[in-house]
Amino acid sequence: MNIFNQLKQDIIAASQQLYNNQEIANTATIETPKDSFNGDLSSNIAMIIASKESIAPREVALKFKEVLVTLPYIASIEIAGPGFINFTIKAESWQAAIKDILQHEEKFFEIDIDKNSNINIEYVSANPTGPMHIGHARGAVYGDVLARILQKVGYSVTKEYYVNDAGSQINDLVSTVLLRYKEALGEQITIPIGLYPGEYLIPLGEILSKEYGNKLLTMNDVERFKIIKSLAVEKMLDLNRKDLADLGIKHDIFFSEQSLYDKGEIEKTVKLLESMGLIYEGTLPAPKGKVHEDWKHKVQKLFKSTNYGDSQDRPIEKADGSWSYFASDLAYAKDKIDRGANHLIYVLGADHSGYVKRIEAIVKALGQEKVKVDVKICQLVNFVENGVPVKMSKRLGSFASVQDVNKKVGKDIIRFMMLTRQNDKPLDFDLVKVKEQSRENPIFYVQYAHVRTKSILSKARELMPEAYNSFKEGKYNLSLLSTEEEIEIIKLLAAWTKTLEASVKYFEPHRIAFYLINLASKFHSMWNFGKENSDYRFIIENNQELTLARLALASVIQKVIASGLEVIGVEPMVTM
């Protein structure tokens, strides 16, 4: 049985029995206490009921204890702190969890949660101005793994890349390619500061020179701009797609910002918001740091962003009368909603943390409070090689590209390491350490655990074929898995789907990497105990019954590690 789910259902039933209220129990949590002294599982149900019924939490907890302590899988119940109910589960119930995983593998890896959402998740959305640098890899991996997890548990998910092909950086890209075109024609050039000096744009100049000769030089500015922009954006997007594909990332949609202008979508969105009374003409206060007397108050069209929790209303026009970036963000969000999305997730870099409130305001307004929105920020990656920081700047022409790092360490290492810290915390990525074969290298440690579990099963088939066949037929006595180390591993295995569920609930894929590292650590510890004491070995040739039970344990460890690696897009290794 799934102990977490069973306890939750029993708490809901007890809530109905004691307080005629099972709905409130659905909000209660079932967690694994950080300190094993507090039992195996803990719930906050008493505090939730107490708040609703205006009763002391400990009084509520004691009533729940009277009902729940009679359950056959409960060994004991203790009340802690302000009213936490701590449960100790009987060993045989944990052992039964292993049998449940082996006999109902597909069902075990399913999660029963509300899936009535059509989710659009936008991530990466890097300006198509050059090869993708490693700084974008974190958001790319985070967004991709989050999408994979959501899809795994049954959500409808659209993975989207917003192509910023209408901004000033595209103008700079076109200017740089024009210079490379002139260079291809034999002209001596100098790339001014502010443009893109990297050699990756040289081939674009050569393509243009072969196709047009010197015709572009005499062409009018508007026509020439369109030709160069079309080629440059296409080639840079091809480059970015390949960089992402090499990381195992594939978006469903690449959405052009320019298309919003070309199709008049911004005008349509503004008219809609005007009809809703959300656009007005007004002035904004002086920005922080500006002397009030020096600030020129300009009447402009503003969106009532403060109606939805933003710190100030947002201009939808620039000083020259053209649409602001915010205006295109409005139209883009409307397009997503019009396509049927009822939950928008934006994955942004640390440099866009100031956009959170305004994006939330956009979606709340256009979705009329019926569309969910989550904005997740990925903090910076401190990327070093041999202790020396690597500069990451397209404009300087020197940066660690995704392609370069991929060639050095491979996509699996990049994907795993980008999940070794919570997304909103800075991450250190050391190229040397990620290639070490030591316990200090988390990806190696997890993969090595998977390899070892596979080797246990292979060795058993070779040394004890009769026992191995009995294991495959399900002839094992799991009550023999009774050591403290074995029970601790089983508890962790039983918590796998709970970990996956939490990753979905809180949009925190790093929980999976943390879980795998923890599981690998406990497995390796037991393996090492076997080196010191033969009674702890997984294969004991003179004890077939215990070997059968431990083969079952090794098999489940292997399946869970493989499932965890696969859901984050990392291929489980079979040999090293």
From Swiss-Prot:
Sequence motif 'HIGH' region, residues: 126-136
Alphabetically ordered keywords of this record: Aminoacyl-tRNA synthetase, ATP-binding, Cytoplasm, Ligase, Nucleotide-binding, Protein biosynthesis
Main location: cytoplasm
Enzyme class: ligase
NCBIfam families in the cross-refs: argS
Protein name as annotated: Arginine--tRNA ligase
E.C. numbers: 6.1.1.19
Membership in a protein family: Belongs to the class-I aminoacyl-tRNA synthetase family.
InterPro entries, per database record: aa-tRNA-synth_I_CS, Arg-tRNA-ligase, Arg-tRNA-synth_N, Arg-tRNA-synth_N_sf, ArgRS_core, DALR_anticod-bd, Rossmann-like_a/b/a_fold, tRNAsynth_Ia_anticodon-bd
Quaternary structure note: Monomer.
Gene Ontology cellular-component terms listed: cytoplasm
Record keyword Ligase present: yes
Subcellular localization(s) per the UniProt record: Cytoplasm
One Pfam family named in its UniProt record: DALR_1
Organism superkingdom: Bacteria
GO annotation terms (biological process): arginyl-tRNA aminoacylation
Originating species: Rickettsia typhi (strain ATCC VR-144 / Wilmington)
PROSITE patterns: AA_TRNA_LIGASE_I (PS00178)
Catalytic reaction equation(s): tRNA(Arg) + L-arginine + ATP = L-arginyl-tRNA(Arg) + AMP + diphosphate
HAMAP family, A to Z: Arg_tRNA_synth
Gene Ontology MF, one: arginine-tRNA ligase activity
